């Protein structure tokens, strides 16, 4: 699957149904107190789990990108997996 981040196409693995359900649960846990009360550590762990799903070797696959861009890649990937990205909404007719 391809995602686009700041004009760059990034190739990531597709997500299985069980992985998607797990990611949805983690997302709900991280955001349970609202977006203003998200702890950075919890958010980064969520992105780390996303990286483990998206890439065979996240350390190696992401090492050529600056840290801030890595976060953008993983956030875009997570939103795509959860069906919350603009691209996913368009494909679903939303």
Predicted regions span which residues?
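Short, surface-exposed, charged amphipathic helix/loop patches that serve as local interaction elements
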Residues: 11-94
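Short acidic-hydrophobic surface loop/beta-edge motif
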Residues: 1-8
């Amino acid at each position: 699957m391809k995602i686009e981040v700041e004009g760059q196409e990034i190739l990531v693995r597709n997500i299985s149904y069980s992985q998607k359900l797990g990611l949805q649960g983690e997302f709900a846990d991280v955001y349970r107190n609202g977006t203003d009360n998200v702890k950075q550590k919890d958010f980064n762990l969520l992105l780390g789990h996303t990286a483990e799903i998206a890439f065979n070797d996240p350390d190696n696959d992401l090492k050529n990108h600056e840290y801030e861009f890595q976060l953008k890649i993983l956030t875009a990937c997570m939103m795509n997996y959860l069906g919350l990205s603009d691209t996913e909404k368009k494909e679903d007719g939303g």
